[in-house]
Amino acid sequence: MMKVLVDYPSEEEEFVIAQRVTGAATAVAAVASMGQLGELQQECRKVYVDPSLMQYAVKLVSATRRPERYELAEIAKYLTYGASPRATIGLIEGARALAFMRGRAYALPEDMTGLVGDVLRHRLVLSYEALADGLTPDQIIQRVMKRIAVPDKPLAPGQSA
């Protein structure tokens, strides 16, 4: 669903990792049952995602496939393949999960905008021209995000303007 960039650990952190992996097995206590995890998934699916936020996800992903439709013709030469509809689903589900973890029953734009790079970066296939110009998927994503307007904060269900 995502490709999260993680820096290398410090030497101290790497030492701890090496100790844990190569040392004796330690007992691990379950913190949740499979049933409880299933219940959490069902609760997460109840988080409201406003149609304007869903449309934002669709536009972000679509702009990687048809950049000229979004006045992004300058990036078309850098993309061999854009993201598929699975990226749209990943953005929506990711925003829903973040909202749930943040204790809300509805997703806000910031729940989605922080995930765009993680969801899209491994789904874009850059052209040889992009590689020759030293461009990264994240740079292309930033151009798309600057062009596609973030929706106004959607109201929670049942609220009126």
PLM-predicted stretches and their roles:
Residues R69-A161:
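C-terminal engagement/docking regions of AAA+ P-loop ATPases
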Residues K3-I75, M101-A105, P109, A130, ...:
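Conserved C-terminal "switch" segment of AAA+ ATPases
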